[in-house]
Amino acid sequence: ERGIDRHARNTLIEEQSELPPVAFQDLTGDIATYEWRKISIEGTFDDSNQILLRNRYHDGMYGFEQLTLFLFDDRKIWVDRGWVKAGSDATVPPQLQPTNEQRISINGRLRLDSSLPQGKFFAVSNDSQRNLVSQLDARKGVQTENFYIDLISASDSTMNPDVPVELPELSDGPHMAYALQWVFFAGLVIYGRRLIRKTA
């Protein structure tokens, strides 16, 4: 079952991520049906509300993912702006992606609250990896939507992530391989029984 679930998830990610981008205002129905779809939104970043997700690695180097609040149409969302390298030691803060508060257009993948990357948020309880957006909202005293954006690019190129959030590895893993082996084995057994009956 794990292999089948993973295969279905991988298929969904692959199909959604290959669709052309769509403007946020053109989305209709349940927002969950657009997870992993590339969307565009116009608004402004609020650099007074930023958070770092620690325990993130890139090319073997320790770092963080930088999340910044984004304001649009009287609504708020968190935007994952990609990986930033940690400072030389615990006392040196990382060099964050630049932010300005001018109105810009951003392009990114729509993600659901429950699919936030694993890790630990600064100043946020790590008791659960679920509903982390809600935890961020409570810590920062804001109310955001129940989705967030993995930033891909911005109309102001200086705000493009140096290391964007990558799609998860789309591997079905060993569970699917085992499942296919069992299906193949079962087929051989059925075929063998029929062959025995014919020769009997």
Which residue ranges define each predicted feature?
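Surface-exposed, charge/polar-rich loops and edge strands
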Residues: E1-A200
